[in-house]
Amino acid sequence: MGKVIGIDLGTTNSCVAVLEGGEPVVIPNSEGNRTTPSVVAFGKDGERIVGEPAKRQAVVNPEKTIISIKTHMGSDHKVAIDDKNYTPEDISAMILQKIKADAEAYLGEAVTDAVITVPAYFTDSQRQATKDAGKIAGLNVRRIINEPTAASLAYGLDKTDEHQKILVYDLGGGTFDVSILELGDGVFEVLATNGNNNLGGDDFDQALMDYIAEAFKKQEGIDLRKDKMSLQRLKEASEKAKQELSSTMTSSINLPFITATNEGPKHLNMDITRSKFDEITSHLVEKTMGPMRSALKDAGLSASDINKIILVGGSTRIPAVQQAVKKITNQDPHKGVNPDECVAVGAAIQAGVLTGEVKDVLLLDVTPLSLGIETLGGVFTRLIERNTTIPSKKSQTFSTAADNQPAVDIHVLQGEREMAAGNVSLGRFELSGIPPAHRGIPQIEVTFDIDANGIVNVSAKDLGTGKEQKITITASTKLSDEEIEKKIKEAEEHAEEDKMQKEKIEVRNQADSLVYQIEKTLKESEGKIDKEEEGKVTAELEKLKKAVESDIVEDMKKAIEDVNTVFHAISQKLYEQAAQAQEAEGQEQAGDDNIVDAEYEEVKDEETQGEDEK
């Protein structure tokens, strides 16, 4: 069996590693570098250029150069090049093909299998898209693993006998994740995860780029962002300045001939201090603090419980980021892992776990958001709670909401709001062919199954007929830039409102069910119930129906209580009547048994008498 490689498919840069002699080794690319820019370009003749060469030619070919495609994974985004549309999966596959070829050149053998990392907060469709990109690139993706979890493997492989809690802060080029893990006895267990799929180093570049562009516009009256070539030069200069400011206090930006007017060429010369950069990007650093606090809260830990802080991603080299993390955790981050390479190293270790090369290591990851379905009244019914360890399988039985309902619509959702409308729709499917029956009678078993890749499969089965429908969620989540990050925050802000609305729907459903059951019982027990008592129940039922129309929770609750009180006496009498009928039937059967015994004894006597006569 060939080697299984570990790939960190990043927004800005990608990296690949493999286990050699039980130790993870980062594979250099064909240019001799340990990371590869996640950039794809198309030359004049349609030639495909990937990695460092693509990044180098971006200034002269901005329209046919694609960067940060990872931010569009799982969406219907298209890149139009030379009258052809490319999906994010297509572009990502080109990067993966380059990585695959470099790995094959290094190993001297064909590579067919890989473990690929994704941000912990990637949705189901984004994970599926990553797996599809691997398939397009000719790779059998053995496992999708979360980036912070991979980083923890890189950190803790030689510390499996130690018991500690670690916080992984992963700020990449386009995504941000934070995960809390517990490490001990070879088990890497994720306790909680949080993040933002649309926050990363690119946003820091953009903030600095906008500041420089506005300053130039104020001075020269020209907006450099309107010219694609000037914009690309400005972007590269901003990225370089950001990197320099991690180790120096000032960075000089010099872009001669950045643009031209009738008066002649214009040059851009500007000094950026670290304090100015920190001021420009302070809101971005602060955006990472919320998910960090939420992850600690979800894990049931305080900052003092954390033993080690692991920083992952090139953007964590920014001093302001390190200071912000230290401010919350009251400790310096661990410097023992390479933030650019540790995710790929962790992926290679996971590959070794899958092949059996690495033993006594167990990885327990979690799902970042709750999963469930929409039920009567638009309520979101959770089947799998957020931060549940995966793989996980959970079933729950539901029923029909109307008499003779021939089909049920299963609407699959992801999020933290109590009402379905406040969550993300992942997809829907229909289970049809349900035999005619009163509502509440059919038993529909809905099963959610999340595999180790975090990909969701949902099935619905009619337990009466055995009919079943399944769906693998592949639909785009269609989320705007900050929707996923806002899910839990929105849930907290709207918790009371959602709780009241959910209670109202549940009480209304309870009332409807009670009316249905009692009216059914009255009809089936006609002639067995005292007319006066039946009249009392009917009157209370009418009051309950009016209370439901009023939509006031307290009125509905009181009406339900009143109906139950009046109906209790009738149900008691019906129970006693049924018990008496059963007792009478039992006595009748006992009488029949006695007659049979008597006949048997008489026959025996006759035979005995006959023998005596002989």
From Swiss-Prot:
Residues recorded as bearing Phosphothreonine in the entry: 175
Superkingdom of source: Bacteria
Induction record: By stress conditions e.g. heat shock.
PROSITE patterns attached to this UniProt entry: HSP70_1 (PS00297), HSP70_2 (PS00329), HSP70_3 (PS01036)
Alphabetized UniProt keyword annotations: ATP-binding, Chaperone, Nucleotide-binding, Phosphoprotein, Stress response
Biased composition range(s): Acidic residues: 590-614
Entry's Gene Ontology molecular function annotations: ATP binding; ATP-dependent protein folding chaperone; unfolded protein binding
Record region (Disordered): 579-614
Compositional bias ranges of the Low complexity kind: 579-589
Name under which the protein is recorded: Chaperone protein DnaK
Protein purpose: Acts as a chaperone.
Family: Belongs to the heat shock protein 70 family.
